[in-house]
Regions:
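Fe(II)/2-oxoglutarate oxygenase catalytic core
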Residues: 1-159, 165-191
């Protein structure tokens, strides 16, 4: 399923390009149990520093290790991002320079308005990918801002791609656990 970018006349909006099967979603969630994928503190970028700020971002995260047993996931993400980029964005992209990150938002977890494009490693992010992995939670909506807040009706396994400069947030999870996978396709800096 490919949905054209939503809500922008320039075509650089949010798009759903695919849906992965539930067994793949479960396999990705289970990656947090493997010690090769380290749990890391979730940080927020402020100017040129990264800090822990639970008022802005409250989530647990696991970095998916750059090891052969995880190559299938990297290949899948790169293929999907290339598809979205060729169809809609037409950015100069090179690949996945940063490792994908598995996120768990428990009750009261959230991430306030932000963009994925920043300084340091984040300065070359072009296409952001978000894949919700489950539906057993309340709240936690993925919202985008473009001349007003837009909530997407998305389900587990939907592959959401958007330019990394688009502001977005995850609203507060009211109950349950919200699992998602995020990744960023990089390229030369925007001009």
């Amino acid at each position: 399923m490919i949905i054209p970018p939503i809500n922008r006349p320039d075509g650089l909006g949010v798009t759903c390009i695919d849906n992965i099967k539930q067994e793949i979603c479960t396999k990705i969630i289970d990656m947090h149990k493997d010690p090769i994928n380290p749990k890391k503190p979730a940080r927020v970028q402020t100017d040129d520093t990264n800090v822990i700020d639970i008022e802005t971002r409250q989530v647990e995260q696991w970095v998916i290790a750059d090891l052969p047993e995880n190559d299938w996931l990297t290949r899948m993400l790169c293929t999907m991002a290339r598809q979205a980029n060729e169809e809609f964005f037409h950015f100069d992209i090179c690949g996945l320079y940063e490792r994908p990150v598995l996120l768990k938002y428990s009750a009261l977890g959230k991430y306030d308005w932000h963009t994925d494009l920043g300084s340091g490693d984040a300065s070359t992010r072009k296409v952001s990918i978000v894949i919700p992995l489950n539906e057993e939670f309340a709240g936690g909506e993925l919202c985008f801002f473009d001349s007003g807040e837009m909530k997407l009706q998305i389900g587990a396994g939907d592959v959401i791609c958007f330019p990394s400069f688009i502001p977005h947030r995850v609203k507060t999870v009211l109950s349950g656990e919200r699992w998602s996978l995020v990744a960023w396709i990089s390229g030369s800096s925007f001009r």
